[in-house]
Amino acid sequence: MLLFLSVPQPRPPGARTRAGAARLVRWRRRQRLRLLQLRRLRGLLRGLRRRPGTGGRRPSRMALCGQAAGAASLPSELIVHIFSFLPAPDRLRASASCSHWRECLFYPALWPQLRICLRVSPAEQPRLEFLMRKCGWFVRELRVEFAAENYLSGGGGPGDGGSGGGTDTGTGGEDGEALQLSSRWLEVLRIYLELVLCVLLSIRNNRNLQKFSLFGDISVVHQQGSLSSTYLSRVDPDGKKIKQIQQLFEEILSNSRQLKWLSCGFMLEIVTPTSLSSLSNPIANTMEHLSLLDNNIPGNSTLITAVELERFVNLRSLALDFCDFTAEMARVLTDSNHVPLQRLSLLVHNASVMLKSLDNMPNDEHWKALSRKSSSLRVYLMVFDIKSEDMLKILKPSIPLERVHFDSYVTCVSGAIVDLISRQYDKFLTHFILMNDMIDTSGFPDLSDNRNEDPLVLLAWRCTKLTLLAIHGYTVWAHNLIAIARLRGSDLKVLQVTEESIDFDQGELADQDVDPVQNLIEQVSLGLGQSWHAVLDIESLSVFTEPNRHFYREMQSFSEDI
């Protein structure tokens, strides 16, 4: 209300003549009308602040409805202005009370950006269709994440688990469970394709789009082998839907007039090697961010070539599969007509390394040239199950590596690799994540085996800019954890170590006077200068349960932080 009441009031016009007296009457009438509108608006805002069940004298709905409140008579511009100050829940509550207010809910000024996280389920489709029908044609920033529900862990219904006896029953139960699991994934993919089509159809003619981001977390791609030859071919046997999705994506790119941010990660065959050619030269020349990550492209084909990259002269951040980032691309990015690249995110996946060669990757001289071109260049590396010998080829000394995330299912990271990272990237490294999901009855691997010093302690000692350290699935000795906390102190903002990864020396366990767990918590908290405790539930760590999504979101914030 202060915003409206603080407007200076005009002085009444002179009334010395008959015309002046008439002007004075009209002025007073306008002032009375204006005061009445302000009183109505004050009551309306009081009603918005009320919540149901608070015991107010009047329900908030009465302040919004009816002729007494005058809500329907307020101009649309004023309603939109009021909406702009309200949080989303209050905005929806207000719009539900009056048809005139509902009409103003989806004004373009109120929805400059739209960020949607969808479960791949039938219930989401009508909601998505409604929202995209209202906002898809004008929204400037659109980020959509598709999250598949955990169909792999639910098992079957009653009767699937071998409740009867005998060998034949057991075999039949296994076959039935596999069949049910297959039908679940077929349903997931069918709905997924429908949701993607809904999004793309709604924005095909949106020429205001500036940021467009798509993320599809369909884990069946990595867990069940080649999707194209199994599930996807059964859901879309003639390939019509996939072709329609690819054509719509290219149509969006060709129609864009203001696009500066394009990001597509872990989607199913949406981006093709010819998709970027749909971008006009003026748009490609002004693009600031481009990320094309693990889009399930069969064979050894790539989504972007060095020749195509030459058009993106204004690129400030780039995210690609590591095997697609070649020495020729590094040379293109160092050309004088390109602005300095400031953020580079690279995904190293064992599936890509097996299909594509590492022979074309940039050498140390290329990395030196990139660093000379841009002193602020920083690199984010996400590594899935890469052997130590391949990592030794990848980790060139001149990479300005700021973040590294290891996620292992088969191949563990060695202590030698951790030691190499701490020596080569001590001036840059801020984030270090070690995740291991291997099932090994012999226990977690110990990085400090046959070493005088623990590599993790050396990492904390050498890397003075380290702010985040997360570990699961590797043995971390309690005394080493205390040393890490003391070395980095309050500069280490995040220290996440799972309880099952922590081990104690026999001497610490033998001391009857001290509780080793409580002592560890106290010493680490003292070293960090803040309260600390181990992660008790590994399922609460999204970096472990959803590594793809975690990397994609971190890549987005990493690229925006320029």
UniProtKB/Swiss-Prot annotation:
Residues 155-176 are annotated as: Disordered. Pathway: Protein modification; protein ubiquitination. It comes from the Eukaryota. Keywords: Ubl conjugation pathway. Residues 155-173 have a biased composition (Gly residues). One of its GO terms (biological process) is protein ubiquitination. This is F-box only protein 33. It comes from Mus musculus (Mouse). The lineage of its organism: Eukaryota, Metazoa, Chordata, Craniata, Vertebrata.
